[in-house]
Amino acid sequence: MFPMVTEFMNYGQQTVRAARYIGQGFMITLSHANRLPVTIQYPYEKLITSERFRGRIHFEFDKCIACEVCVRVCPIDLPVVDWKLETDIRKKRLLNYSIDFGICIFCGNCVEYCPTNCLSMTEEYELSTYDRHELNYNQIALGRLPMSVIDDYTIRTILNLSEIKT
């Protein structure tokens, strides 16, 4: 008779313990139900990137002196700089400058070490294409400034994640 009573007591304790665990999980679920979602509706809402964000590189053709410092500091020797030596003035003349963003790791070394500041990072990060050859930007494509997220009236901008919660 006593083993049956002890088994019943163990069963009761196990039931109470299981109910407590289920209750704890349910309380956590209810505490998260009051919070707003952290996700944003991406094409229509975008986070404003920080000033130091390393997006697509912007290139100013007129400032470049074809020194090739950007190529030397790039860990993957990515920028392609074509130039011709002008013998009458003894200076290099830039013919072509291109960067393949399919290979670029966006480290920012080229921007940091450029002596004439002809390279800068933009806030553009939507570089996806269906053809990888479209990611090879020449000096004309690199010279175009992207539209700022703040200036685009079709997009609702969100400063940071704390603004989503309020």
Swiss-Prot record:
One of its GO terms (molecular function) is 4 iron, 4 sulfur cluster binding. Pfam families: Fer4. It is an enzyme of class 7 (translocase). It catalyses: a plastoquinone + NADH + (n+1) H(+)(in) = a plastoquinol + NAD(+) + n H(+)(out); a plastoquinone + NADPH + (n+1) H(+)(in) = a plastoquinol + NADP(+) + n H(+)(out). Keywords: 4Fe-4S, Chloroplast, Iron, Iron-sulfur, Membrane, Metal-binding, NAD, NADP, Plastid, Plastoquinone, Quinone, Repeat, Thylakoid, Translocase. One of its GO terms (cellular component) is chloroplast thylakoid membrane. [4Fe-4S] cluster 2 binds at C74, C104, C107, C110. PANTHER family: NAD(P)H-QUINONE OXIDOREDUCTASE SUBUNIT I, CHLOROPLASTIC (PTHR47275:SF1). This is NAD(P)H-quinone oxidoreductase subunit I, chloroplastic.
